[in-house]
Swiss-Prot record:
EC code: 3.6.1.9
Active site residues per record: D75 (proton acceptor)
Protein name per its UniProtKB record: Nucleoside triphosphate pyrophosphatase
The family this protein is said to belong to: Belongs to the Maf family.
Species of provenance: Prochlorococcus marinus (strain NATL1A)
Free-text function comment from the UniProt entry: Nucleoside triphosphate pyrophosphatase. May have a dual role in cell division arrest and in preventing the incorporation of modified nucleotides into cellular nucleic acids.
InterPro entries: ITPase-like_fam, Maf-like
Cellular compartments annotated: Cytoplasm
CDD domains to which the protein is assigned, alphabetical: Maf (cd00555)
Class of the enzyme per the UniProt entry, highest EC level: hydrolase
Length: 211
């Protein structure tokens, strides 16, 4: 079985979509402690932090070595003109950002940290360092020109406040996206092509389409 180190419902739905049976373990990693201005490095470190936190929980519960085959930590952020847009903290910030994003483009970066749970190793450091791979997948997103009415109406819904950049491409936010250049599932929360390629790397493609 597969472990997803994320509470994101969108990521869970992506795994359900490809019939990847999984257990969710929400990490205790404190994202606020990471003050990194570079978006690519930051999202990579966040993904690793989440994965390592979930791995620690598994080891403490004595499950990692006999129950699960792989663990994935993910995190996403939106980069707009060199500035990092994470989840909006309030309606005012969301509206302000959308007024800037309207008719413009930016990049959705998702960091991935995949750990193959090797039964021959018993400590966290050995497992995480010697049986892991990481990567950042970036998708360019171009937004439509939006009216103040549209922005305010979207900001009045609950959807954008749990999303990096303040939009959900798979939800109502998809109405405002003109086009993307890159991986679609990456914008939702994780790159399925990246996951498939790296599960194959560890001989774990059998976990996919396990209906």
């Amino acid at each position: 079985m597969f472990v997803l180190a994320s509470a994101s419902k969108a990521r869970q739905k992506l795994l359900d979509q490809i019939a990847l049976r999984h257990k969710v373990i929400v990490s205790d990693f404190d994202e606020t402690q990471l003050q990194e201005p570079d978006p690519i490095l930051k999202v990579k470190l966040l993904a690793k932090g989440k994965a390592d936190s979930a791995l620690k929980k598994l080891i403490e519960e004595n499950h990692a070595l006999n129950t699960y085959q792989a663990l994935l930590g993910c995190d996403s952020l939106f980069e707009f003109k060199g500035e990092i847009f994470e989840k909006p903290i309030n309606k005012e910030q969301l509206i302000s950002r959308w007024k800037r994003m309207s008719g413009q483009s930016g990049f959705l970066h998702t960091g991935h940290y995949l750990i193959s749970l090797d039964n021959s190793k018993s400590d966290m450091e050995s497992i995480s360092q010697n049986n892991s791979c990481e990567g950042v997948v970036s998708t360019k997103i171009e937004f439509m020109n939006l009216s103040n009415f549209e922005i305010n109406k979207y900001a009045s819904t609950s959807e954008p406040y749990n999303c990096a950049g303040g939009f959900a491409i798979e939800g109502n936010g998809g109405l405002f996206i003109k086009k993307i250049d890159g991986c679609f599932s990456n914008v939702i929360g994780l790159s399925l092509p990246w996951l498939k390629n790296n599960l194959e790397k560890y001989g774990l493609s059998r976990l996919l389409l396990d209906r």
